[in-house]
Amino acid sequence: MYEKIVGILLDYVEVPREEITPETRFLADLKMNSLDIMTMVGEMEEIFDSTIETEDLNEIWTIQDLVDYISERVGE
């Protein structure tokens, strides 16, 4: 799950793969803006056939937060 999410994320950021860790933060470390995040979330919802609630995004700061959130919803 982690590698799949990172693979999707790499389409939205200009950061080398080796600099991305589970603790990498979307805003502070990757400098993603809200449009990037919402577009990425939409793609992940399609790929994982799961809804990521907008209000839940306030609690998803790191890549690991997103992995945990999606894993919980898709049962992985």
Regions flagged by a language model, labelled:
Residues 1-18, 71-76:
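Thiotemplate assembly-line natural product biosynthesis machinery
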Residues 7, 32, 61-64:
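Short linear motifs centered on Gly/Pro in flexible linkers and helix caps
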Residues 12-31, 48-59:
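Phosphopantetheine carrier-protein modules
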Residues 36:
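Two-component histidine kinase catalytic core, primarily the HATPase_c
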Residues 39:
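Conserved alpha-helix in the HATPase_c
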Residues 49-75:
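C-terminal structural segments of small proteins and small subunits
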